[in-house]
């Protein structure tokens, strides 16, 4: 290195968070996730800070805008769903693991879609924001589906794209139904995936 050349410096974004800062960020994300799930994405940042037990400045340091927090919660939910998919892949029974994960995916979608729709209304490219985790999730879902089809438990003509379309349709149907009908709607959908039901 030349004497007149300064060593490269890392930016704040490059440096790992201190343990206390990381804990605060996790508390904010947990509070936001719960608040958005219960009350929708309109909960203000100051209220998120109160529920997380941190100052408003702490929230703004980690998430300068409401949009940034919504994006982080959305990605976090997809990462949670990916972890569930990987756990299902590790299970011995390909049929139960597929249908169990499909129920989880439908439940997740009811909350995830609210955030995705809110971000879309703000002009955010949701597909770009979630690309990496969504790609990994699609691969895991494809493997779960293939295993269930090989076991003869799911129609051979069903694709991952079909599953996504069915989940979106199911969420819409559940939203339009009485709360007590949600389980029945989900059961009807699972039944439609089985051979001989199409």
Features from the language model and the residues they span:
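C-terminal peripheral helix-coil segments that are non-catalytic and often amphipathic
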Residues: 1-12, 107, 139, 143-154, ...
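Short hydrophobic/aromatic patch on the recognition helix
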Residues: 53-63
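Helix-turn-helix/winged-helix DNA-binding modules
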Residues: 40-41, 61, 155
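Conserved terminal C-lobe alpha helix of the protein kinase catalytic domain
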Residues: 71, 75, 79, 86, ...
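Basic, helix-initiating cap at the start of DNA-binding domains
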Residues: 1-51, 68-71
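Hydrophobic alpha-helical connector segments
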Residues: 72, 83-111, 125-129
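Short linear capping/connector segments at secondary-structure termini
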Residues: 117-126
């Amino acid at each position: 290195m030349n004497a007149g050349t300064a060593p490269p410096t890392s930016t704040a974004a490059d440096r790992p968070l201190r343990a206390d800062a990381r804990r605060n960020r996790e508390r904010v994300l947990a509070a936001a996730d719960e608040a958005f799930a219960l009350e929708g994405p309109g909960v203000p940042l100051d209220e998120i800070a109160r529920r997380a037990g941190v100052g408003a400045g702490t929230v703004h340091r980690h998430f300068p805008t409401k949009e940034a927090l919504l994006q982080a919660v959305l990605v976090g939910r997809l990462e949670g769903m990916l972890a569930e998919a990987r756990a299902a892949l590790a299970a011995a029974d390909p049929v139960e693991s597929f249908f169990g994960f499909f129920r989880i995916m439908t439940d997740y979608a009811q909350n995830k879609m609210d955030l995705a729709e809110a971000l879309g209304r703000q002009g955010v490219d949701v597909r770009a924001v979630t690309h990496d985790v969504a790609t990994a999730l699609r691969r895991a879902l494809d493997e779960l589906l293939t295993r269930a089809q090989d076991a003869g438990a799911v129609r051979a003509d069903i694709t991952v794209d079909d599953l996504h379309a069915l989940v979106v349709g199911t969420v819409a149907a559940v939203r339009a139904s009485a709360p007590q009908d949600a389980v029945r709607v989900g059961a009807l959908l699972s039944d439609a995936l089985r051979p001989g039901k199409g």
